Amino acid sequence: SLEMIQKAIGPRDWTALYQQNPVSDDGDYFTRDMIQYFDPADLDYDRLRYYTAWDLAIGQRDRNDYSVGMTVGIDEYDNMFVVDLVRGRYDGFELVEKILDFYEQWRPGIVGIEKSHIEMAIGPFLQKRVAERRLHSAYFKDLKVGRRDKEARARAIQGRMQQGRVFVPEDAAWTSTLVAELLRFPNGVHDDQVD
């Protein structure tokens, strides 16, 4: 199957050969040697503290940006494991359901949502659906991006990656897309996962 081939050849060759999307070994901002991998079967998920962040975009057209939700687990040594990621183009109703489904799956301590006109637009519906789904323990926090550009916002994760403290799963369906976006940052068409 294609999943077996993807595991066998690795993310770099997979994106080049099967997705017609080659990526150089080293990017301008993130380099391939900064990307650490983990085997999800070997991770002790019970010892991690979970956090989720969302970069929102609304619209389903091909030219629209993606909405991205990412859940990370932090271990007792401050290592960060990207345990799950959802990326797609959704309307406002779908987006709210994705946010809440993701919360129910991982039960993060904090769900950060980028403060923007989109967050303000879906906020009342999100609150309504939280009540209807009885997810009262969910803690949502506005992520304020301020006036800093994407490169400035990415510096914290860049430093953590340089220290070898960020890990991505070696075989998740979304790993190759995430790695490709990291290596193209800040010059790629999409940077929603990095953001």
Feature-to-residue mapping (PLM):
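ATPase catalytic-site recognition across NTP-hydrolyzing enzymes
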Residues: 1-56
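Non-catalytic, well-ordered alpha-helical scaffold segments
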Residues: 12, 16, 155, 176, ...
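An active-site-proximal beta-strand-loop segment
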Residues: 54-67
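Acidic, Mg2+-coordinating catalytic module of metal-dependent nucleases/exonucleases
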Residues: 182-195
